[in-house]
């Protein structure tokens, strides 16, 4: 279903990269133009990461079969999901593991009885990912500190805290600050995790 759109996107990006290099587009840009270009290119990267994260989530789901021979990893000759991702993405093990953790946080659950799609662990984080607001760094910055409070803190409280931090990622926080970077998101999430789990 995605094969043709992704192929078209690859061709377009390839043309842009080659053209930008030949035209020395970055060198010729003013500082304000260059800043806008960096921000726009980073947003494109987050959209690409969103597609990759969802794909990794599905690879993980297909590799969770208790029967080893029926796992996607086994079908493709790999020991586990990390090894398969290293092969497919050319990433190192640490980056492959980060992709898996991000996918776990935003992957919608599937009902075992009806096959219906259910909410992800952090719905607002998933929505921010789909909107190109956060990529792998942002997802993990928000979700990792909050996930560490489970099971001592109710899921609803973790989600509410994530919603507040996501507002900061979108630049919609109460202080009117611009969209927060991943490091600031991590600090916000850690603060909420400490507040929710004071005995943890």
Give, region by region, the residue ranges found by the protein language model:
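Conserved C-terminal region and hinge/linker of Rieske [2Fe-2S] proteins, especially
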Residues: 1-200
């Amino acid at each position: 279903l995605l094969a043709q759109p992704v192929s078209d996107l690859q061709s377009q990006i390839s043309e842009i990269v080659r053209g930008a290099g030949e035209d020395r587009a970055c060198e010729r840009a003013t500082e304000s133009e260059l800043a806008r270009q960096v921000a726009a290119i980073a947003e494109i990267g987050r959209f690409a990461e969103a597609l990759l994260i969802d794909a990794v989530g599905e690879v993980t789901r297909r590799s969770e079969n208790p029967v080893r021979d029926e796992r996607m990893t086994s079908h493709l000759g790999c020991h586990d999901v990390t090894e398969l991702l290293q092969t497919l993405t050319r990433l190192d093990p640490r980056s492959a593991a980060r992709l898996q953790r991000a996918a776990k946080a935003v992957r919608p659950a599937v009902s075992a009885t009806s096959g219906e799609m259910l909410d992800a662990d952090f719905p607002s984080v998933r929505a921010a990912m789909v909107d190109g607001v956060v990529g792998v760094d942002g997802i993990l910055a928000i979700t990792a500190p909050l996930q560490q409070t489970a099971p001592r803190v109710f899921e609803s409280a973790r989600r509410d805290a994530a919603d507040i931090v996501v507002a900061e990622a979108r630049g919609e926080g109460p202080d009117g600050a611009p969209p927060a970077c991943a490091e600031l998101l991590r600090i916000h999430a850690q603060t909420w995790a400490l507040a929710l789990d004071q005995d943890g």
